[in-house]
Amino acid sequence: MTMDKSELVQKAKLAEQAERYDDMAAAMKAVTEQGHELSNEERNLLSVAYKNVVGARRSSWRVISSIEQKTERNEKKQQMGKEYREKIEAELQDICSDVLELLDKYLILNATHAESKVFYLKMKGDYFRYLSEVASGDNKQTTVSNSQQAYQEAFEISKKEMQPTHPIRLGLALNFSVFYYEILNSPEKACSLAKTAFDEAIAELDTLNEESYKDSTLIMQLLRDNLTLWTSENQGDEGDAGEGEN
């Protein structure tokens, strides 16, 4: 029995409440594959589902990579760690490929509003960034380049079409600056991008509408936290907190 769109959306909401994000992602993937432009609510459900699904693997990958480095003297343990890391990598790559296919085949093509286009291009930048975190060699160069291209395109549209206080524009600036810091190792560019986004939003705080006030101010706080962390790291202090992402 095939479910119609409203049933699939309901299933995704149930799965979210049960914290079964793989089920949530599968339901929203099926909604997307019906080929209609997603509503804001559907778009957010899709994003939350995959963010949790991929986030669990990114976290596992970091833990296992760290353990692997600590077991260098024990060949057997290190081999076991390597095999397990590669299993997690394969899962992460499959998830990212799924999302990138949905973005290229349906979501970016069907986006009629600048806001949606920026949202999906940011998502494309994010998932290529996640791939680049576990890639090596030529593959890494390709994923890094694809990520930067998607972020840059989204960034240019957001500057033309959206208020500096818009949560999607701010979230893009946050993640693009993390990309510069973590992936391209360009702290100056990362700090400049984050600071500009923060300052421009502060200057127009009175344009914030009621519904996005909480989202926008939260992202502004993350931008400021990252700036503080990155500045202290570049002055030689060891920052122990991870970068905030949206």
Swiss-Prot record:
> Would the keyword Repressor be found if you checked this record's keyword annotation?
no
Q: Where is this site: Interaction with phosphoserine on interacting protein?
A: R58, R129
**Localization annotation:** Cytoplasm; Melanosome
* InterPro entries, per the entry: 14-3-3 (IPR000308), 14-3-3_CS (IPR023409), 14-3-3_dom_sf (IPR036815), 14-3-3_domain (IPR023410)
SUPFAM superfamilies registered for this protein in UniProt: 14-3-3 protein
Say yes or no: keyword Ribonucleoprotein present: no
N-acetylmethionine found at: M1
Which residues are recorded as modified (N6-acetyllysine)? K5, K51, K70, K117
Q: Where is this cross-link: Glycyl lysine isopeptide (Lys-Gly) (interchain with G-Cter in SUMO2)?
A: K51
GO molecular-function annotation terms?
Answer: enzyme binding; histone deacetylase binding; identical protein binding; phosphoprotein binding; phosphoserine residue binding; protein domain specific binding; protein kinase inhibitor activity; protein phosphatase inhibitor activity
Q: For the modification Phosphothreonine, which residues carry it?
A: T2
What GO CC terms are in its UniProt record?
A: cytoplasm; cytosol; melanosome; nucleus; perinuclear region of cytoplasm; protein-containing complex; transcription repressor complex
For the modification N-acetylthreonine, which residues carry it? T2
Q: Which key words tag this protein in UniProt?
A: Acetylation, Cytoplasm, Isopeptide bond, Nitration, Phosphoprotein, Ubl conjugation
Query: Which GO terms of type biological process are on file?
Result: negative regulation of DNA-templated transcription; negative regulation of G protein-coupled receptor signaling pathway; negative regulation of protein import into nucleus; positive regulation of transcription by RNA polymerase II; protein localization; protein targeting; signal transduction
User: 3'-nitrotyrosine modification sites?
Assistant: Y84, Y106
Modification Phosphoserine, positions = S60, S186, S232
UniProt family annotation: Belongs to the 14-3-3 family.
Function statement: Adapter protein implicated in the regulation of a large spectrum of both general and specialized signaling pathways. Binds to a large number of partners, usually by recognition of a phosphoserine or phosphothreonine motif. Binding generally results in the modulation of the activity of the binding partner. Negative regulator of osteogenesis. Blocks the nuclear translocation of the phosphorylated form (by AKT1) of SRPK2 and antagonizes its stimulatory effect on cyclin D1 expression resulting in blockage of neuronal apoptosis elicited by SRPK2.
Fill in the subunit field for this protein.
Homodimer. Interacts with SAMSN1 and PRKCE. Interacts with AKAP13. Interacts with SSH1 and TORC2/CRTC2. Interacts with ABL1; the interaction results in cytoplasmic location of ABL1 and inhibition of cABL-mediated apoptosis. Interacts with ROR2 (dimer); the interaction results in phosphorylation of YWHAB on tyrosine residues. Interacts with GAB2. Interacts with YAP1 (phosphorylated form). Interacts with the phosphorylated (by AKT1) form of SRPK2. Interacts with PKA-phosphorylated AANAT. Interacts with MYO1C. Interacts with SIRT2. Interacts with the 'Thr-369' phosphorylated form of DAPK2.
Any idea what this protein is called? Answer: 14-3-3 protein beta/alpha
State the organism named in the record: Rattus norvegicus
